[in-house]
């Protein structure tokens, strides 16, 4: 009698994020991974063997941004605070490298940032024009956009995402610029996250992603001054997971038919399962 067990049946983990079909529920969060840099430094086959079901690149803006002064990153007892400042080369330089992504075996949701509705829409319009003109196979599979409305707003230093009216204006401008799937990334730094969610959906967003990082500060123990060059930054990691779960659950209850992407402190498969269960 053979003690060899039959192979376990394959489990279908595929899901749909609105119109976007995903092989499984795991999507990388914007800013956590640069696929081109990783492929260049560590694994030339990474684009073809990409493990995530979709790729959300670091936020791109209409004009180049140098980001915040260093230091930009520091650890905490249960997470990391970063203050990168949306450093990026601007949409036109960013578009110029899209050909290098053509081998990426996953749909792409482009993260878009800005300081005004016009800036957000300008990024999307430039990308739409390029994608429409590009020959097949020369660009990645861009399925939609994630609107990062948690970036600083120059008017009074506020966050766009903290103001439902400003959020709706950004989403409306972007909705007019594309027919592709549109996610709005919500800030957790508000009293009621569902207010901005309702504003985004009312203005034409197809889905919501949450949460972005929590505004936080670390002091230099020697000088007792803020450690980061920007004074404050965004806290991520295990410390924020219970709060992120609560917010995702609130949004899921408020908008039960809306596609959602949950994030914040996911370190293990069980962490991811908790977000799915919300």
Functional labels for PLM-detected ranges:
Residues 21-27, 104-109, 177-188, 253-263:
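Short beta-strand/loop segments at the ligand-binding rim of alpha/beta enzyme cores
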Residues 28, 55, 94, 110, ...:
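Conserved, mostly hydrophobic/aromatic
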Residues 31-33, 60, 113-115, 150-152, ...:
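Active-site beta-loop-alpha junctions enriched in small/polar residues
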Residues 37-45, 120-130, 190-203, 252-257, ...:
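Catalytic cores of alpha/beta
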Residues 59-86, 143-160, 214-219, 229-232:
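Glycine-rich, proline-tolerant flexible connector loops at the mouths of alpha/beta enzymes
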Residues 77-159:
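Active-site beta->alpha loop and helix N-cap motifs at the rims of alpha/beta catalytic domains
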Residues 149-165, 196-258:
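Glycine/Thr-rich beta-alpha phosphate-binding loop at enzyme active sites
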């Amino acid at each position: 009698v053979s003690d060899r067990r039959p192979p376990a049946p394959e489990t279908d983990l595929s899901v749909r994020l609105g119109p976007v079909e995903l092989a499984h529920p795991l999507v990388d969060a914007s800013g956590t991974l640069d696929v081109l840099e990783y492929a260049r430094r560590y694994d030339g086959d990474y684009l073809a063997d990409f493990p995530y079901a979709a790729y959300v690149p670091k936020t791109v803006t209409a004009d180049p941004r140098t980001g915040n002064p260093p230091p930009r990153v520091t650890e905490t007892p249960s997470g990391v605070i970063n203050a990168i400042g949306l450093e990026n080369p601007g949409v036109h330089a960013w578009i110029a490298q899209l050909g290098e992504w053509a081998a990426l075996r996953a749909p792409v949701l482009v993260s878009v940032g800005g300081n005004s509705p016009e800036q957000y829409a300008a990024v999307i319009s430039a990308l739409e024009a390029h994608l429409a003109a590009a020959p097949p196979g020369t660009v990645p599979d861009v399925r939609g956009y994630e609107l990062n409305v948690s970036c600083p707003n120059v008017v009074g230093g506020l966050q766009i995402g903290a103001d439902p009216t400003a959020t709706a204006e950004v989403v409306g401008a972007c909705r007019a610029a594309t027919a592709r799937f549109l996610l709005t990334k919500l800030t957790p730094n508000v009293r009621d996250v569902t207010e901005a969610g309702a504003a985004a959906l009312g203005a034409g967003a197809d889905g919501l992603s949450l949460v972005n990082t929590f505004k936080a500060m670390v002091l230099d123990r020697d000088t007792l001054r803020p450690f980061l060059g920007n004074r404050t930054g965004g806290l991520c990691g295990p410390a924020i997971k219970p709060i992120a779960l609560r917010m995702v659950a609130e949004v899921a209850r408020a908008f039960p038919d809306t596609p959602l992407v949950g994030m914040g402190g996911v370190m293990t498969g069980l962490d991811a399962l908790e977000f799915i269960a919300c």
